[in-house]
Amino acid sequence: MNEKLPIVYVARHGDTAWTHSGQHTGFSDLPLTADGELNARMLRKRLQGLNFVKVFTSPLQRAARTCELAGFGAEAEVDPDLVEWNYGEYEKLRNAEIVAKYPEWDLFRDGCPGGESPLQIGERADRVVQRLRKLGGDVLLFSSGHFIRVLAARWLDLAPGCLGRYLSVNPSSLSVLSYEHTLDRPVIRLWNDDRHVAAQTQTNVGRQNQCSVL
């Protein structure tokens, strides 16, 4: 097959204060830190030269600012479906605080009281996937970590929560969804690639978690 298959580039927003503190950041609209802004600019270098039929960003400022600093603010369209998981009562809490009360809790299985279930966030991801598949060209998205994991699962037609606990998505990282050979074979081509991130904030964990599927 000689026809080029569409590619979806998915960028996670840069660091916020709660990225470093480990607090669940769903609808709380936090700005980027100085490192977050720096790394968003490094993402711009990584994406330079690529052309997209559409660019979409979450309305949350951490994603929208990353989009702007990456060089796509003027052309990006806001898509409310790209917002992060609604953590409800668990917003602002650290994972350790939650499991101290509920040791068996698993976000990707149980969701959050007062927030979204895996099924509900999966429905949002489905709407995004449906729109992407109608566009027929390369697309760039700016979103948040847990939503990106659910989006990848739904791109592959897997249950919303089945991949998330096994995948990492670092700040300012780039992942790539596409197809293999034909449009009925969706694949993950690249995952959690943050090689472009500034060296002074690049962590060993980031390098260890990077996974490329060729």
Q: Which residues make up each language-model segment?
A:
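Loop-to-helix element that buttresses phosphate recognition and phosphoryl-transfer chemistry
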Residues: 8-66, 114-126
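Phosphate-coordination/substrate-recognition cap region in phosphate-metabolizing enzymes
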Residues: 2-3, 41-102, 106, 214
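Acidic, low-complexity terminal tails and accessory targeting/binding regions
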Residues: 1-6, 79, 85-96, 153-214
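Residue-level preference for the first positions of well-ordered beta-strands
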Residues: 8, 136-142
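Active-site signature of alpha/beta-hydrolase-fold catalytic machinery across serine-
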Residues: 69, 150, 154
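Active-site metal-binding loops of divalent metal-dependent hydrolases
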Residues: 14, 138, 145, 194
